[in-house]
Amino acid sequence: MSVNRMKKRILLLLLVIPALIKAQDVMTETRQELTSPDGAYRFTFYQRAVGEDNAQMYYTLTYKNRPVIEESKLGVLIENQLFESALGIPNDTCHFWCENLKLTETEHQKTDERWKPVYGERAEVRDCYNEMTLKFKKGEGKGNRDGGYDKRKNYFMNIIVRAYNEGVTFRYHFPEMTNGLFLHIVGEQTSFTMPEGTMAYYERWAQGPYELRPLKGWGKEESERPLTLKLPDGLSVALLEAEMVDYVRGKFR
């Protein structure tokens, strides 16, 4: 065997091994998919193992089998240690709050109805989408009852995903805790990993001037939303935020 051929085989082996490792740490039992009514959009959710007991949430999005959002993280950043300590509830040991969420149930439903707006260009609007609700639980009921107060730590979180023919949405939903525990949200892990070569119409403030620039090299600069993007394959994407009623507005960094 020549030296060159040996180098090629070694290189091939080195390339294959990381790919196998990456595939193996995907928890296949958590993989869930949702498609739009016309089948064009496909949202895929799954978790990857982080150590022995924890897992990180990820998602991808394709349009007609073309990548729109590559593997990206899902999750919120929550700091409850001080509140839990004050109540005598065991603190979390995971690095991120969402790392030890267990997927307990997945619900699917379809909606196709019409509603009449108060004003606008159309007298009737069709509301047609497929919905998937991912239900998570945190904690295994560890703790005790002290003087009637339930000190067992059980948190619940849902991710509600809707796929329309026009696009895909998702939101975090926190059902009310039965023992009065609340959540101190300090940030998000939510990310949008776009294909290499994507360009963004950067806007520093609302109604400010637009600047077409690469996604790299922003530093600490932030862009207003919605953020319009041009993918290298010709697709255009808009990242939006909705129902800003009881939550802070976001920016893209």
Can you annotate each of these PLM segments?
Residues 1-29:
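Bacterial Sec-dependent N-terminal signal peptides
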Residues 27-253:
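N-terminal accessory beta-strand-rich subdomains and adjacent acidic, glycine-rich linkers
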